[in-house]
């Protein structure tokens, strides 16, 4: 192999390792058997969610995972592998891919990493069932508002009772 090719591959490994380190979540899938139309729809959905999706050779992924400190991912890099990286939303890649697997049997989640910790296929699928950040914030807000709302209703009821008695 020529020096130029080796240098290019080393650069790819370094780039992918940096993406793995910076990613809030990584989902690795086997996309073998997807039609071109399905692949296009999947990529568009991921892009709209702010997720980067790439098909990368397993040898490059293995070396990049080692550099990123995700050695346990090596077991997942068997057969064709595509990787979804998200730097902001931890749930987005898992949710989009899990939703897509319901319509496309060919797509299979192999594993991933969440906040730098290696995760199994089952953990990624469980993550996909959680609401996104905005959904979680609205749930938290409604939980925080409930006691205040209940006090307001109680005060209103007392005021109405006093008006009715007067």
Curated annotation (Swiss-Prot):
Keywords from the named record: Ribonucleoprotein, Ribosomal protein, RNA-binding, rRNA-binding
One biological process term in Gene Ontology: translation
Recorded GO CC terms: large ribosomal subunit
InterPro entries: Ribosomal_uL10 (IPR001790), Ribosomal_uL10-like_sf (IPR043141), Ribosomal_uL10_bac (IPR022973), Ribosomal_uL10_bac_type (IPR047865), Ribosomal_uL10_CS_bac (IPR002363)
Pfam families, A to Z: Ribosomal_L10
Gene3D superfamilies: 3.30.70.1730
One Gene Ontology MF term: large ribosomal subunit rRNA binding
Family as reported in the entry's similarity comment: Belongs to the universal ribosomal protein uL10 family.
NCBIfam families: PRK00099.1-1 (NF000955)
Protein function: Forms part of the ribosomal stalk, playing a central role in the interaction of the ribosome with GTP-bound translation factors.
Subunit (UniProt): Part of the ribosomal stalk of the 50S ribosomal subunit. The N-terminus interacts with L11 and the large rRNA to form the base of the stalk. The C-terminus forms an elongated spine to which L12 dimers bind in a sequential fashion forming a multimeric L10(L12)X complex.
UniProt-recorded name of the protein: Large ribosomal subunit protein uL10
Organism: Streptococcus pyogenes serotype M1
Gene: rplJ
């Amino acid at each position: 192999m020529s020096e130029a090719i080796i240098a290019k591959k080393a650069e790819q490994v370094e780039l992918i390792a940096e993406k793995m380190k910076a990613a809030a979540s990584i989902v690795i899938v086997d996309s073998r058997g997807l039609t071109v139309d399905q692949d296009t729809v999947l990529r568009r959905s991921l892009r709209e969610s702010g997720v980067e999706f790439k098909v990368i050779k397993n040898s490059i992924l293995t070396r990049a995972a080692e550099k990123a400190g995700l050695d346990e991912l090596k077991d997942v890099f068997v057969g064709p592998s595509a990787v979804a990286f998200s730097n902001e939303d931890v749930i987005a890649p898992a949710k989009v891919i899990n939703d897509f697997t319901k319509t496309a049997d060919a797509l299979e989640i192999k594993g991933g990493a969440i906040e730098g910790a290696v995760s199994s296929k089952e953990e990624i699928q469980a993550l996909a069932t959680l609401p996104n950040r905005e959904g979680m914030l609205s749930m938290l807000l409604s939980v925080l508002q409930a006691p205040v709302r209940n006090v307001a209703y109680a005060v209103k009821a007392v005021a109405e009772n006093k008006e009715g008695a007067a």
